[in-house]
């Protein structure tokens, strides 16, 4: 039975997620898609259970009246049928509670937030690189986890508090009116007083909750940032500095917690005073009516029981409302991140890219970063012929990496077009575009998975033999075979650590090269692809790279000019403009920037001049 309910709500829907709206209620409504029927069912059962509980007091009052007017011998015979009916109602309530519990806990409690995490995660995977340039990875993760749980808890609390308590309050007011309309007065006054207290405290708790959620995300982000860059922290002996950096975030989080607890304490004191007044007022009025013959003993017992129950309910409501608006604050904070519009999206008419020849054309391309008014490119024109191998050269900030990022459509151009085989990349799908381009970067990050998983990232359907062949061609198989970990795993089954931290820089770069060899895309981009390799390994890999580049369109970037001197054509960029182009010998004879850079080489690396610009964005 449990498993039947657990399978009612699909946890991992296959349809593409849609960015939810930014409004609070519209965001929550969008989150309930696929689960609304089940949420309605727990709302109905919650209302029915609340009405049932109110009816129990009426039954209890009648039983007390029967006890006061009948002898023990008469009681069973006179009221047996009614008591049997009461017993049947009590037994039937167990079925109602079972349904409510199964839907709440088996259908929704785990499946619903997991479904939201899945959808939010897919939305964040589709976000543009510019989004992650301004966000902590840990902060984004925290908001995905927190917001999913907060939406679930806010819905559950709304059902329990708003619907359940409203049904209960209506039930006991109607019951009190059936006894004597005057018995409604203390209950109604308590409801008004409690409503006023909620109106004062709850919005303030919600505002604090929003600040607290943001402070928690900032604290988590700073701590995660330190762990993710632990090598840099250790290298510069900044453990104390990082601790202080995290402490400031922790202090800010603690301040929001202190503000929250002050409000909670005041709310609890006010709530206790209201509960005391309710108990005294309701009990006193019931006893007064009994003393004047206007109410029976059963009515007095029922009213006192209702007042006691409402008093205990009020404490529960207070904590639920406090947590509800803390969750509201968490959701509002999550909305700011999870509903951001992607800066790079597929066009409505986007089609898969078809690469037949590999010609690349930059046609009057203009581009500037969002946070910089200065244009990186202003009318760049460059044609790369099918199968041509070009090398990009330039000082830092010349635009080399930006040109590659635009080709990969990590950013959209501000003007002009980039075409591959005549197809505007703005009108092809991003997945098909990047599937057609293999790239090795100098900053090689590996996934915290096995060596096999990282290699097969290049082509998941590759065979074991193809994977091992690619490793051998990249001069990686020898060190992979020697790998061992503390779990007894070896070779391709060893986990490489977060970002590949268990491997040296050269080993990571060889894995990245093997991965691109396995991908075997028609366009190849090499951004300092061999910068972390020693000369002996580089010479060995260069032969494999030459074989890999055969028949492909290649763009190579390297500060070590000897690495790209043999390319078909060298393009020299300076301040976003093409200032020289030609073969190695032609550019040396021209005596321009390339010749000067070649002359400044020291140990095979590019010596930056004093006029070199800031690091490329």
Where are these regions (language model features)?
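Membrane-integrated ABC transporters
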Residues: 1-53, 68-86, 100-109, 122, ...
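Juxtamembrane helix-loop junctions of ABC transporter transmembrane domains
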Residues: 2, 13-21, 52-61, 65, ...
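Transmembrane helix-loop-helix hairpins at lipid-water interfaces of multipass membrane proteins
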Residues: 39-96, 177-184, 280, 293-297
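Hydrophobic alpha-helical transmembrane segments of ABC transporter permease domains
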Residues: 40, 44, 52, 56, ...
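Hydrophobic alpha-helical segments in the permease module
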Residues: 86-97, 191-199, 264-278, 284, ...
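Loop segments that connect adjacent transmembrane helices in multi-pass transporters
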Residues: 135-138, 211-259, 331-336, 349-351
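Cytosolic ends of transmembrane helices, especially the final helix of ABC transmembrane type-1 domains
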Residues: 215, 238, 262, 309-339
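ABC-type nucleotide-binding domain
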Residues: 353-617
């Amino acid at each position: 039975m449990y498993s039947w309910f657990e399978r009612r709500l699909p946890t991992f829907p296959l349809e593409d997620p849609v960015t939810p709206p930014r409004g609070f209620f519209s965001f929550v409504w969008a989150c309930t898609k696929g689960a609304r029927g089940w949420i309605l069912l727990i709302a109905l059962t919650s209302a029915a259970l609340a009405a049932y509980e109110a009816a129990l007091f009426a039954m209890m009052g009648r039983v007390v009246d029967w006890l006061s007017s009948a002898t023990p011998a008469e009681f069973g015979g006179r009221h047996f049928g009614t008591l049997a009916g009461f017993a049947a109602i009590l037994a039937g309530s167990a079925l109602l509670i079972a349904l409510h519990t199964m839907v709440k806990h088996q259908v929704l409690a785990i499946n619903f937030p997991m479904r939201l995490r899945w959808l939010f995660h897919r939305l964040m995977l589709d976000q543009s690189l510019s989004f992650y340039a301004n966000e902590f990875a840990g902060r984004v993760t925290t908001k995905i986890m927190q917001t999913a749980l907060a939406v679930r808890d806010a819905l559950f609390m709304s059902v329990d508090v708003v619907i359940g308590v409203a049904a209960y309050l209506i039930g006991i007011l109607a019951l009190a009116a059936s006894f004597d309309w005057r018995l409604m007065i203390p209950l109604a006054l308590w409801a008004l007083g409690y409503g006023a207290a909620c109106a004062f405290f709850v919005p303030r708790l919600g505002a604090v909750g929003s600040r607290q959620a943001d402070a928690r995300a900032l604290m988590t982000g700073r701590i995660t940032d330190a762990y993710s860059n632990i090598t840099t922290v250790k290298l510069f002996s900044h453990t104390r500095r990082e601790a202080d950096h995290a402490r400031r975030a922790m202090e800010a989080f603690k301040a929001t917690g202190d503000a929250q607890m002050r409000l909670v304490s005041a709310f609890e004191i006010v709530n206790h005073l209201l509960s005391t007044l309710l108990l005294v007022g309701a009990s006193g009025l019931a006893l007064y009516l009994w003393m004047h013959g206007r109410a029976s003993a059963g009515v007095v017992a029922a009213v006192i029981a209702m007042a006691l129950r409402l008093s205990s309910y009020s404490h529960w409501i207070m904590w639920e409302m406090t947590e509800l608006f803390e969750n509201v604050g968490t959701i509002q904070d999550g909305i700011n991140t999870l509903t951001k519009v992607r800066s790079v999206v597929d066009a409505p008419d986007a089609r898969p890219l078809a690469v037949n020849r590999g010609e690349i054309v930059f046609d009057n391309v203009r581009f500037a970063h969002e946070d910089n008014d200065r244009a990186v490119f202003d009318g760049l024109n460059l044609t790369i012929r099918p199968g041509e191998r070009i090398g990009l050269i330039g000082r830092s900030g010349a635009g080399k990496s930006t040109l590659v990022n635009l080709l990969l459509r990590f950013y959209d151009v501000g003007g002009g077009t980039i075409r591959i085989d005549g197809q505007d990349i703005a009108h092809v799908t991003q997945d098909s575009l990047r599937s057609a381009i293999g790239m090795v970067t100098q900053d090689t990050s590996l996934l915290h998975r096995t060596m096999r998983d990282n290699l097969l990232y290049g082509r998941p359907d590759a065979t074991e033999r193809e994977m091992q062949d690619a490793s051998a061609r990249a001069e990686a198989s020898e060190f992979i075979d020697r790998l061992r970990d503390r779990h007894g795993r070896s070779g391709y089954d060893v986990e490489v650590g977060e970002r590949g931290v268990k491997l040296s820089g050269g080993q990571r770069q060889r894995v990245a090269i093997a991965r691109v060899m396995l991908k075997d895309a028609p366009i190849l981009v090499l951004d300092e692809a061999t910068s972390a390799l020693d000369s002996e390994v580089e010479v060995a890999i260069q032969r494999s790279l030459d074989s890999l580049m055969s028949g492909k369109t290649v763009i190579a970037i390297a500060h070590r000019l000897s690495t790209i001197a043999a390319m078909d054509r060298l393009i020299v960029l300076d301040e976003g403009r093409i200032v020289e182009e030609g073969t190695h010998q032609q550019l040396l004879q021209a005596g321009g920037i390339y010749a000067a850079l070649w002359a400044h080489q020291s140990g095979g690396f590019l010596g930056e001049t004093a006029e070199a610009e800031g690091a490329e964005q």
